[in-house]
Regions:
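Membrane-embedded alpha-helical bundles of multi-pass transporters/translocases
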Residues: 2-456
Length: 456
């Protein structure tokens, strides 16, 4: 029997625009905050890395806290949409703050300014906004195909925004005259774009009522009666939740190393404009793969095999990027970057649907629905993995003797470190992700649970 549909095409597209907002924050921050802080503000990369690492201590708590708050929320807008809507205004203010550090302040005050703005952005406002956004996948439809389509639209906008930001930001900063004022202007423009697109996404969908979301075959405790301790226990008793958390963290660590490309292109390939070219090679294939992911899921009768085998392809191709890098062949690096991205695309497209299946797994086993808390893995992974990745890149550059000047000649130790960070670490992370995906067959587990219930 055909599943009931809940969404029109414009609901899915409108929902997807929310990741334009998410990426004017995340892509801008992860790609350019380190080079802005070191080369424009003049801060030490090692100290910046340490501050980011300390900031991450808050994230694990706030992720699950906001997930729980979403589960307990009851309003005319629903559970998640209020948090998504109001949370982004805080994102905009604090993102601007990160890229508007006054040059007149002393170094200690500049470090403090950055730490406060960065922590509020990540641990509070981005957390509330992003968990709510991800949770909408479970709250606006019960149709598994529509959930995959929502994920595909979302990440098409995500990678499209990532592509634009990585391609135009360096040139835009130069166009506005360079220096602190230019970075502040660019940040302001991105904040306005984010507010507009986030608002569009919030009002493009409507959450289903609690009655509509219930499965009559499952009886259990109401989610708003669960304690914080009970929710934590439910989350980590679901092995698939833990797997997805680890994958998300590894993906963001990998993305942080790929974003070291701005340093690799500047000091190894001696052409910083290549960063935009590689961004195209990375993001355009992802967008293409996302567009066909719903069809591939249908043809392969599920997400598990598609995710496993496509990521195997991505891992092999990323190894070839490293080989091409040591050969000094930019064309070969670009070709294998394209193939890597094509392999990564299906998982990016159906990731939200897999998390929704993960949430369904907890519901089928316990009778307790904790969608908001379950989707905390998305924000936790993005912020913890991304933050540690940026911190790690700062530490590794500092240890290798990085000189924070645009036209500096970097020592051999630093050049070798850039090779390791940009070429080898992404490959290592891809291997681990592929292994975890080979065990992430939550669809099959849910089918067995439903069959057992029907036979009882």
């Amino acid at each position: 029997m055909e599943e009931k549909t809940y969404l029109k095409w414009y609901n899915k597209v409108g929902y997807g625009t929310g990741d334009i907002a998410g990426n004017v924050v995340y892509a801008f921050l992860s790609s350019f905050v380190m080079i802005y802080l070191t080369n424009t503000v003049g801060l030490n990369s090692g100290i910046v890395g340490t501050l980011i690492a300390v900031s991450k201590l808050f994230d694990g708590v706030t992720d699950i806290f906001f997930g729980t708050m979403i589960d307990h929320t009851k309003s005319k807008m629903g559970k998640a949409r209020p948090w998504m809507f109001y949370g982004f205004f805080g994102c905009a203010i604090t993102l601007f703050g990160v890229f508007a550090i006054p040059t007149s302040l002393g170094k200690t005050a500049q470090y403090a300014w950055f730490f406060i703005a960065y922590t509020l952005l990540n641990a509070v406002f981005y957390t509330a906004n992003n968990i709510a956004y991800a949770a909408l996948t479970s709250l606006v439809t019960k149709n598994s195909k529509e959930r995959v389509q929502m994920g595909s639209f979302r990440f098409m906008f995500s990678f499209g925004t990532n592509l634009v930001i990585q391609s135009v930001t360096v040139g835009a900063v130069e166009m506005f005259g360079g220096g602190a004022t230019a970075w502040r202007t660019i940040a302001f423009i991105y904040c306005i774009i984010g507010i507009i697109t986030n608002t569009l996404a919030v009002f493009s969908v409507k959450e289903l009522s609690d009655e509509e979301l219930k499965d009559d075959s499952v009886a259990g405790e109401e989610d708003d009666k669960l304690s914080f301790k009970q929710i934590i226990k439910l989350l980590f008793s679901n092995k698939y939740f833990s797997m997805i958390c680890v994958i998300y963290i590894l993906q963001q660590l990998r993305a942080s190393m790929v974003n070291v490309g701005i340093f690799f292109m500047t000091y190894v390939l001696l052409n910083k404009n290549l960063f935009g070219v590689f961004s195209w090679a990375n993001n355009i294939p992802l967008i293409i793969a996302l567009a066909i992911t719903p069809t591939l899921v249908s043809k392969m009768k599920g997400m598990y095999k598609l995710n496993k085998y496509s990521y195997m392809l991505a891992t092999v191709c990323r190894l070839m990027v490293a080989v091409a890098g040591y050969l000094g062949s930019v064309p070969l690096m670009l070709i294998f970057t394209v193939l890597t991205s094509l392999g990564e695309g299906p998982w990016q497209g159906d990731m939200s649907a897999v998390i929704a299946q993960c949430s369904e797994h907890t519901y089928l086993k316990s009778g307790k629905r904790i969608d908001g808390s379950m989707f905390s893995c998305t924000s936790l992974g993005v912020k913890l993995g991304g933050g540690i990745g940026i911190a790690l890149s700062g530490w590794m550059l500092d240890i290798s003797g990085y000189i924070n000047l645009d036209n500096a000649v970097q020592p051999d130790s630093c050049i070798n470190m850039m090779y390791f960070m940009y070429l080898w670490l992404p490959f290592i992370f891809d291997i681990i992700i592929t292994v975890i995906l080979s065990f992430l067959n939550v669809e099959s587990a849910n089918m067995k649970l439903k069959e057992n219930m029907q036979n009882q």
